[in-house]
Amino acid sequence: MAKAKFERTKPHVNIGTIGHIDHGKTTLTAAITKVLHDKYPDLNAASAFDQIDKAPEERQRGITISIAHVEYQTEARHYAHVDCPGHADYIKNMITGAAQMDGAILVVAATDGPMPQTKEHVLLARQVGVPYIVVALNKADMVDDEEILELVELEVRELLSEYDFPGDDLPVVQVSALKALEGDKEWGDKLLGLMDAVDEAIPTPPRDTDKPFLMPVEDVFTITGRGTVVTGRIERGVLKVNETVDIIGIKTEKTTTTVTGIEMFRKLLDEGQAGENVGLLLRGIKREDVERGQVIIKPGSVTPHTEFEAAAYILSKDEGGRHTPFFNNYRPQFYFRTTDVTGVVTLPEGTEMVMPGDNTDMTVALIQPVAMEEGLKFAIREGGRTVGAGQVTKITK
């Protein structure tokens, strides 16, 4: 019995199952926890199917989503795995980024091949920047004809290539989640083979501390005799005392300054790291030079923009969203990080209006610049009430 000990140092990766309804996403999720529990009992608890299927509801940016979270370990890595019971939950999760994915397992039933939701999930994965996909060709025990399996695999590869994933090169593994869950050894081994493919083909993402420094400004105040302090939670990177930073967004000009002090809980620090709530003392900056909604960054690492394309989910009436559709030139507020900026929405050609509960692509022109990169999340608000959520898919100006 192979023993793998729990190492806090194991690389951590966030993944999820995506694919058409009833192709076996939840069964596969349960089966993965079972075979890994059987192989490394010290490391893994098995999660039953009905535990995952009755996913608790979460609220993200005012949107209610059912998401099941399970965790497990292979010999190489520690995984957090998300599975959503309903198709609408998937769309909401992927667009709002409630649970970020470093990679996805695309589940396709060998008995059906790619179906409409398979396409929709692959398109969304491309739009919202899920960087890597591994394919689980599920229910392979129900197809006797090797040629049919090969045809389905080819179809899936073509679909992935169509959406700019490396369809010819990524792993496609034949599995039977149900048989593995029932304890069949042969199919259990094939599922371990799938996890080997996930270990190999989905790279460990860079840690937040390795990325360029960025902190959204939450508050600004003056300390007599010391200068201006801005507070916020460091989103990524590391900042050391006496480093130079840029303050960008909201205003037309960027400001460059030096950080002369970093404080946390009234203690002075040499450096601040991703995830920490800190106050930064800025040299030569007046209180009115900085405002909530701007970001403090490693110089040159991010730029402010006013126009972008986005994928958005619009809340239904039941979720507390709008009761009526909106049309071209809709002007809500877009809430980025810590502040609202008004923007004008242009709908895609051929889209007359967007109903509450829909997901849509849109182009947005903001009235003030916002520091942004592709993948940045936002809420759509009307007078402080959330009516939608989305993320930037392409910056145009």
From Swiss-Prot:
It holds the Pfam family GTP_EFTU_D3. Residues 62-66 are annotated as: G2. It catalyses: GTP + H2O = GDP + phosphate + H(+). PROSITE patterns: G_TR_1 (PS00301), G_TR_2 (PS51722). Residues 83-86 are annotated as: G3. Residues 176-178 are annotated as: G5. Residues 19-26 are annotated as: G1. GO terms for cellular component: cytosol. The keyword Protein biosynthesis applies. It is found in: Cytoplasm. One of its GO terms (molecular function) is GTP binding. GTP hydrolase that promotes the GTP-dependent binding of aminoacyl-tRNA to the A-site of ribosomes during protein biosynthesis. This is Elongation factor Tu. It comes from Kitasatospora aureofaciens (Streptomyces aureofaciens). The gene is tuf1.
